[in-house]
């Protein structure tokens, strides 16, 4: 039994496939989805989605959004997403280092919030590209 997964950003369909298991970062923590999961609508945090297709795991960096599951159909609407295979590891590490420095040097509430979001995005991309299964 499988789940039909569809990940959509505002300007494109990021990914469509069948999956045996999905692990997501929701606003209330990590959640795992298996076939025949109860209907669910949840907000997603910036983080890595892990998808198992047959016995192979794949990582996707999600930049926040919503996930809905019903009748083994999972639809994920995100602000942006990148498959790990599309991320340059060197560029992801450089972006993470820069975001970490900016976060540590942030002054004031607005700058701290913006730096924190940039840091979370960079961290998600780096975790996705470095995921080992």
UniProtKB/Swiss-Prot annotation:
Q: Where in the cell is it found?
A: Plastid, Chloroplast thylakoid membrane
- One Pfam family from the record: ATP-synt_DE
Q: Which domain of life is it from?
A: Eukaryota
MF terms from GO for this chain are: ATP binding; proton-transporting ATP synthase activity, rotational mechanism
How this chain sits in the membrane, per its record, is: Peripheral membrane protein
Supply the Gene3D superfamilies for this chain: 6.10.140.480, F0F1 ATP synthase delta/epsilon subunit, N-terminal
Q: Which UniProt keywords apply?
A: ATP synthesis, CF(1), Chloroplast, Hydrogen ion transport, Ion transport, Membrane, Plastid, Thylakoid, Transport
| Gene Ontology CC entries for this record | chloroplast thylakoid membrane; proton-transporting ATP synthase complex
The record describes the protein's role as: Produces ATP from ADP in the presence of a proton gradient across the membrane.
> Assembly state and interactors?
F-type ATPases have 2 components, CF(1) - the catalytic core - and CF(0) - the membrane proton channel. CF(1) has five subunits: alpha(3), beta(3), gamma(1), delta(1), epsilon(1). CF(0) has three main subunits: a, b and c.
Family, similarity comment: Belongs to the ATPase epsilon chain family.
PANTHER family to which the protein is assigned, alphabetical: ATP SYNTHASE DELTA/EPSILON CHAIN (PTHR13822), ATP SYNTHASE EPSILON CHAIN, CHLOROPLASTIC (PTHR13822:SF10)
| Name of the protein in question | ATP synthase epsilon chain, chloroplastic
Species name: Zygnema circumcarinatum (Green alga)
């Amino acid at each position: 039994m499988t789940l039909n997964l569809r990940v959509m950003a505002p300007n494109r369909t990021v990914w469509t496939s069948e999956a045996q298991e999905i692990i997501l970062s929701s606003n209330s923590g990590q959640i795992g989805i298996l076939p025949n999961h109860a209907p669910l609508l949840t907000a997603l945090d910036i983080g890595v989605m892990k998808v198992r297709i047959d016995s192979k795991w794949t990582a996707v960096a999600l930049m926040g959004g919503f996930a809905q599951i019903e009748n083994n159909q999972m639809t994920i609407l995100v602000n942006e997403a990148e498959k790990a295979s599309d991320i340059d590891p060197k560029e992801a590490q450089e972006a993470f280092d820069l975001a970490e420095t900016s976060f540590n040097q942030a002054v004031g509430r607005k700058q701290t919030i913006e730096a924190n979001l940039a840091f979370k995005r960079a961290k998600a991309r780096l975790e996705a590209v470095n995921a080992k299964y």
